[in-house]
Amino acid sequence: MSKRPVSGCGNSLSVGFRAVRAATVLLLVGSLWAAPTTERLMVVTTDVSKPGKAFSPPTAKKPAYYVPVFIGYSELGDVAQHFQRRPPDEPIQRAAVLALAKMHYLPASKEFPPTLTIAIEWGTITPVYLNQTVINAAEIRARVLGSQQDRFGARDAAYRQEMLSLLGRHFLIVSAFAYQRKPTPESPDVLLWRAHASTGHWGHFLEEAIQPLIAVATPAFGRPTKPGVIWRDHTGLVEIGESTVEELGIK
């Protein structure tokens, strides 16, 4: 598969496939690093495609096995003068694998062959201005809201400005595809679901924000979730905007 950044929630996406067996063993060792204690708003949503609705959510008794593909870090848009710095990859990869395991998505092996390929991307996107217009607005919103830019929950009305913000953001995107060894033009990658989590980058480097982003995205893995705003304070996670799980008509 060729490497390509995520955009929206199409039915297919080619990503960079890597040899991951040895890396997977490494990622399963260790634990999450300490999360920052500062309050911040985070937007979470998950798109589920029509093919994705045919897959039953994994359980402890019947987990789903996957091949991980780490698209990794990207800096998109304009150059940010503040709070833009590449974090180390390994702790993020480890945290993502552990988060997926909490939702019963486990790395595949010879004993347990894969049914999924799960691609993980993180980074920072900054607006590009031309004559006071943000010309990469669609790209920013694709990473924040996916395919659900007009599907806010009623309780999220007060946070519409946060969800539609075009200021610079740190983001995490986790995408699940039906597994195949080698996609072709006749048999392209089939997207099943894509989870998005993002937060404004002002005040924190991505290294400080990524673990809370993974934490708030975890319950939304594989579950149709309307865009919702979650507030993290120093005592833990407090849900303010309701991330409503429901059946969505996404093709």
Region locations from a protein language model:
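Second-shell loop/turn segments in exported
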Residues: L76-D89, H104-L106, R160-E162, H196-H204
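Surface-exposed patches in mature extracellular/periplasmic domains of secreted proteins
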Residues: K102-T115, T225-D233
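N-terminal secretory signal peptides that target proteins for export/translocation
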Residues: M1-F17
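Short secondary-structure boundary motifs at beta->alpha junctions and helix caps
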Residues: R155-R160, H170-I230
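Envelope-exposed proteins and targeting segments
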Residues: K62-A64, M103, P114-L116, G168-I173, ...
